Amino acid sequence: MKNKGRNKDMKIGIANDHSAVDMKNEIVEYLKSLGYEVVNYGTDTYESCNYPEYGEKIGNAVASGEVELGIAICGTGAGISLAANKVNGIRAVVCSDPYTARMAKEHNDANIIAFGARVIGIETAKCIVDEWLNAKFEGGRHAARVDMIMDVEKRNHNL
């Protein structure tokens, strides 16, 4: 696969809850082996914790520009992505397959991907990460649609 969107100088944030410590650690090592700088916003213990805290942390890190992109992992990917999506400017998408990850970047300009440590295995997770990092936002008609999504956020965020 061509590295259409990959920028190895990119700083990537990663967050997780207790259910995803092992997967997070493997993804961190994988990203480092590819030459990325990785910032850990997740827990490093198996003690039960609350995924919304970590979704907010990764959302804020991406929205502020502290990191360029984020990866969020909990049991299913759903809860942590919901929390991240509450942060202005975040477009977090749960991905359980590489195709969805690629389309999330190419068509939706997803700045955070999420997946479930209890849903997919580590090799699938690595493939998802690769597809997402290699993809590039296509712009054009997709940019207009992303703008529409962001307009929804602006209209409804302060209800």
Q: Model regions: which residues?
A:
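C-terminal binding/interaction regions
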Residues: 13-15, 19-20, 98-159
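Glycine-rich phosphate/diphosphate-binding loop of Rossmann-like nucleotide-binding domains
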Residues: 10, 14-33
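Helix-adjacent hinge/juxtasegments
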Residues: 54, 58-94
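A short beta-strand-loop structural module common to alpha/beta enzyme folds
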Residues: 37-48
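Short, Lys/Arg-enriched N-terminal segments with co-localized hydrophobic residues
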Residues: 1-9
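Solvent-exposed alpha-helices and their adjacent loops that cap or buttress functional pockets
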Residues: 7, 63-66, 85, 105-107, ...
